[in-house]
Amino acid sequence: MQQLQNVIESAFERRADITPANVDTVTREAVNQVISLLDSGALRVAEKIDGQWVTHQWLKKAVLLSFRINDNQVIDGAESRYFDKVPMKFADYDEARFQKEGFRVVPPAAVRQGAFIARNTVLMPSYVNIGAFVDEGTMVDTWATVGSCAQIGKNVHLSGGVGIGGVLEPLQANPTIIEDNCFIGARSEVVEGVIVEEGSVISMGVYIGQSTRIYDRETGEIHYGRVPAGSVVVSGNLPSKDGKYSLYCAVIVKKVDAKTRGKVGINELLRTID
């Protein structure tokens, strides 16, 4: 694996000079191998190691290189034809392979090659970008978008129209991460490498980026870039210091554990926030 990484790192340093016409065989094969490993889930752009999320920047570099080494080509889709550098993940799937991999894909859902989809996942008409990782038992609902390199945990529900931000550049930026057993309400947006920790519930229409204040009403603490585990979050506002105006924030209205989540429905958690 180190040799593969070395090839990618070296090629990335001279990426400005690489074209589909002049790319060398070693680089092309290395990039294609990484995309294949991302596609199968054998590699992932970010993973939790000793309780901390670690981003493998060289894998992002491989994804960026894939755009340098490939020409656009005609791609057949369910209702139309497309013209792009990245093939669709399911272009060569037959019924046997779908049965073997064990997930459902509802037309016209689109997944780019280099994204991993785990067993028992349901993809409603949605979009999953290259480098993303979608773990077991997750529902990606209608018109939801999973951005490039985003990491989606087990048993997550991304409701209709949810946007999970992608990140390829700048390289130092970390991917957006939704940990296991989270619920993201309709039309909410989580972007810019924000981490939503395990078991959290995000209400409908909540927007969270790195600069969004995440206010815990029980403690008065303000978080940035991270929703603590087990949080129930709704949209809100915080007043300015002079009291003349207020600005948008996300509000943690309560904390729940797995036992409570198991007994109480998501809608009930969001209704009883007083």
Curated annotation (Swiss-Prot):
Pathway(s) annotated for this protein in UniProt: Amino-acid biosynthesis; L-lysine biosynthesis via DAP pathway; LL-2,6-diaminopimelate from (S)-tetrahydrodipicolinate (succinylase route): step 1/3
Documented EC number(s): 2.3.1.117
Location of the protein in the cell: Cytoplasm
Enzyme class: transferase
One Gene Ontology CC term in the entry: cytoplasm
CDD domains per UniProt: LbH_THP_succinylT
Keywords annotated in UniProt: Acyltransferase, Amino-acid biosynthesis, Cytoplasm, Diaminopimelate biosynthesis, Lysine biosynthesis, Repeat, Transferase
Catalytic activity: (S)-2,3,4,5-tetrahydrodipicolinate + succinyl-CoA + H2O = (S)-2-succinylamino-6-oxoheptanedioate + CoA
Tree of life domain: Bacteria
Main localization (coarse): cytoplasm
HAMAP family given in the database record: DapD
Family: Belongs to the transferase hexapeptide repeat family.
Protein name, as recorded: 2,3,4,5-tetrahydropyridine-2,6-dicarboxylate N-succinyltransferase
Gene from which this protein is expressed: dapD
